[in-house]
Amino acid sequence: MLVNAIRQKVSEVISKAYGSEIEFEVEIPPRKEFGDLSTNVAMKLAKTLKKNPREIAKEIVKSLDEDPSFDRIEIMGPGFINFFLSNELLRGVVKTVLEKKDEYGRENVGNGMKVQFEYGSANPTGPFTVGHGRQIIIGDVLSEVYKELGYDVTREMYINDAGKQIRLLAQSLWARYNQLLGVEKEIPEGGYRGEYLVDIARDLVNEIGDRYKDLWNEEVEEFFKQTALNRMLSSMKDTLEKIGSSFDVYFSEKSLIEDGTVEEVLKLLKNKDVVYEKDGAVWLKVSAFIDEEDKVLVRSDGTYTYFMTDIAYHYKKYKRGFRKVYDIWGSDHHGHIPRMKAAMKALDIPDDFFNVILHQFVTLKRGGEIVRMSTRAGEFVTLDELLDEVGRDATRYFFAMVDPNTHMVFDIDLAKAKSMDNPVYYVQYAHARIHNLFSNAEKKGVKFEEGKHLELLGNEEERVLMRNLGMFNTALKEVAQMFAPNRLTNYLQSLAESFHAFYTKHVIVDPENPELSNARLNLALATGIVLRKGLKLIGVSAPERM
């Protein structure tokens, strides 16, 4: 809100004075003596106008000098313009939050553009890992924020239910089933050794007895494929429910083969003369688009590669009407990006359609020591286990609070701590304190009137808190522009910090001063609205008592 207001005022001045439109930053300066907000617009304009940036800054300041939104405006260093905001402008933020309530922060940036976030996608061959958990939360937060900014968002999970890994899953389950029946069967090379398959096999023995004991044919293979798939997908959805995540679409890789999409795309590529046959396989001319080797689409045995079905999947996304798609992948898949972009180009799909957000890996820490992510063959720390230990709120918040581009160390002890050192506790405690203020006011007979006596707000802690409330929309736009959920958690930490400082230094509920109490309760109420909304966008609760 505040950044938008400053940007609009400055833009009007430079448009009128120089006939220019230019992108520039407005942000909170590093030190409070530099004002409430600062801009580098004069330096940006200096390059275009070939003028001294301080001279440009002086002209801008002169045009804004009489504006009641500012107590004063100062020029710093090479041409930074520092704004000291008026109490009137800051009080207006509180008024706006109280009027808009849960609508506060919403802005129609996307204008209904149809976008898709695809994340959490995995082979349904085992439980979600903590790495999947990080990806799911990144996708959830970005989806929520994009909706808040006026985009038509679809959340989608791609189910890799075709190909050799599903056959290996079926063979692995069949081996476990036979082992329980006393038949020695080896899990195939590259198969799945996790204990979770023993549990499914045990259920099968109870359900069908020895029907498929030491028997393997097409019918048996299909039975074990479907059984394993259904059980794994059901388990994955249970985990998603536990972490508080849901998808609009679960898209089957197998469906792309069954409905003819893969063949349609292969035919399109052949017609565009970007494929060729060699050694009995069909290859895409990746090298015609980027400096990379050509890739196989159809193997010599006639089966499709993952690359082929992935191209078909993204072609179908385009045909479904999405203007932009955002795939969230682990950083180990970065090599797949250029060849996918080459494939999109080969299909004449716009360059800005296909986008990938990469995230780094997760390491768990307990008692100051790194937790071994893998115990014995086929076993690893699952997302379910992490959720059981630290709970949904801490899991979601901790995954959101680290930049996706940074390797994450998830401190289990800190996530469980009921102390102000725990970031999610710190923010939630601010919300609980606010709720308690209103209970306290009622007990002390202080009558609350919403929106009244805001003119009494203006000390240093109140100003910082009001300014931070005015930065909520800016934080949301940073999340969207940088694909960084941590921009929202950083904002909430800052807002909670400024509230705790205000709460600690000042008497908020004072029966001897009901008007000032009202003003401060209104500021607290506005803060609670924004904290609650920010936490909701992350999928974290806002408790009223702690």
UniProtKB/Swiss-Prot annotation:
It is found in: Cytoplasm. It is an enzyme of class 6 (ligase). One of its GO terms (cellular component) is cytoplasm. SMART domains: Arg_tRNA_synt_N, DALR_1. The keyword NADP does not apply. Monomer. PROSITE patterns: AA_TRNA_LIGASE_I. Belongs to the class-I aminoacyl-tRNA synthetase family. One of its GO terms (molecular function) is ATP binding. Its EC number is 6.1.1.19. It comes from the Bacteria. Pfam families: Arg_tRNA_synt_N, DALR_1, tRNA-synt_1d. GO terms for biological process: arginyl-tRNA aminoacylation. SUPFAM superfamilies: Anticodon-binding domain of a subclass of class I aminoacyl-tRNA synthetases, Arginyl-tRNA synthetase (ArgRS), N-terminal 'additional' domain, Nucleotidylyl transferase. This is Arginine--tRNA ligase. Keywords: Aminoacyl-tRNA synthetase, ATP-binding, Cytoplasm, Ligase, Nucleotide-binding, Protein biosynthesis. A motif ('HIGH' region) lies at residues 122-132. It catalyses: tRNA(Arg) + L-arginine + ATP = L-arginyl-tRNA(Arg) + AMP + diphosphate. The keyword Zinc does not apply.
